């Protein structure tokens, strides 16, 4: 297993109310990698229109006859819209009880894998105990994320595996603010600098 993450790796980005890019309004993003070359993360609180069985069919992991054999939890497994970059590519954030050669340890107990094998394992209920599947990712070139943070585009917060994998998708934005001690109704879109 590889280890990566960087300064912001394993942290949450929470969009400020003044976020100008409509793709990221009220977004909560888990940063998987951050370095001088840029950053990449997965949006946690946006569902993708494609379901997990359809994704498995599209990737050739199963055929149409095998779709009916999937368990109910697997049929209902949500797929997230991970971001606008590489939107047809799958990414899995997961607990550290699953690893292959391509798995990257992002933070304590949180890994990242982008292979067909992990999707096969999840579909057979032999994958990690906790997983979040996304299509696409959010990416920033060198210095771009830092510039957005300095102009109050994002809040930065720590997270936990339970928040990442178990909290309600529709409440993730408000919950992430509350965990920071911020009442979402009082958060304003404009901030000053001292």
UniProtKB/Swiss-Prot annotation:
GO terms for cellular component: cytosol
Pfam families for this protein: DUF179
Family recorded in the similarity comment: Belongs to the UPF0301 (AlgH) family.
Name of this protein: UPF0301 protein BH04450
Organism of derivation: Bartonella henselae (strain ATCC 49882 / DSM 28221 / CCUG 30454 / Houston 1) (Rochalimaea henselae)
């Amino acid at each position: 297993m590889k280890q990566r993450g960087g300064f912001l790796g394993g942290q949450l980005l929470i969009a400020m109310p003044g976020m100008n890019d409509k793709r990221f309004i009220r977004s909560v993003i888990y940063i998987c990698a951050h370095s001088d070359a840029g950053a990449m993360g997965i949006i946690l609180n946006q569902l993708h229109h494609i379901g997990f069985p359809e994704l498995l069919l599209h990737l050739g992991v199963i055929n149409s006859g095998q779709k009916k054999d999937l368990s109910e939890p697997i049929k209902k497994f949500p797929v997230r819209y991970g971001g606008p970059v590489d939107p047809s590519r799958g990414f899995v954030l997961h607990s550290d009880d699953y690893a292959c050669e391509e798995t990257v340890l992002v933070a304590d107990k949180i890994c990242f894998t982008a292979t067909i094998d992990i999707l096969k394992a999840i579909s057979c209920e032999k994958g990690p105990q906790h997983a979040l599947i996304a299509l696409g990712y959010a990416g920033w070139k060198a210095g771009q994320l830092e510039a957005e943070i300095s102009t109050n585009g994002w809040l930065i917060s720590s997270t936990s595996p339970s928040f990442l994998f178990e909290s309600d998708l529709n409440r993730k934005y408000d919950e992430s603010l509350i965990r920071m001690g911020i009442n979402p109704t009082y958060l304003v879109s404009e901030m000053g600098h001292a």
